[in-house]
Regions:
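Active-site scaffold of zinc-dependent metalloenzymes
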Residues: 1-34, 42-50
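Long, well-structured alpha-helical subdomains associated
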Residues: 62-63, 76-134
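Surface-exposed loop/turn and secondary-structure junction residues enriched for glycine/proline
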Residues: 12-15, 24, 52, 72, ...
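Post-HEXXH active-site segment of zinc metalloproteases
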Residues: 29, 33, 43-72, 88-102
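Walker B catalytic acidic pair
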Residues: 38
Length: 134
């Protein structure tokens, strides 16, 4: 379920299995990117992909950072499928913005080198679930 409400930020709520989107997102591309990011988080719950990174999001900064990277990678794949991504850095949905977001979280991941492949694999699973290609 998706609710576009007046919250100051967008999020996924496990309590009611709902993506909450800020009604003030700046443009269509950014809206979809944010929606896909939060939708990716929703795949981590028990009964779906049951990701440790989602289950322990609030208890470990390392796992929180990993979950954010998974969600952003998944959103990037979905945006590319919808032709919403761009190499134009003036575009609000440029690959540069995605890279910057992931790099910010990367600093909090203890062993980035061995973790990156796992994160990409988890993002691919989330993407497949959302697209219904499992």
């Amino acid at each position: 379920k998706v609710i576009i409400d007046s919250v100051d930020y967008s999020s996924y709520s496990i309590d009611d299995d709902t993506v909450h989107l800020n009604r003030h997102l700046k443009d269509k591309e950014y809206w979809y990117s944010t929606y896909f990011h939060e939708l990716a988080h929703s795949t981590g719950i028990k009964g779906r992909l049951n990701r440790e990174t989602f289950a322990n999001y609030e208890t470990s900064e390392d796992l929180k950072a990993q979950e954010e990277c998974i969600a952003e990678m998944t959103a990037s794949m979905l945006c590319a499928d919808c032709n919403l991504s761009s190499f134009d850095t003036s575009c609000s949905l440029s690959y540069a913005n995605t890279v910057a977001y992931i790099q910010a979280w990367k600093k909090k991941i203890k062993d980035w080198g061995s973790t990156f492949i796992y994160l990409a694999s988890e993002a691919e699973k989330a993407y497949a679930m959302i697209m219904g290609i499992q």
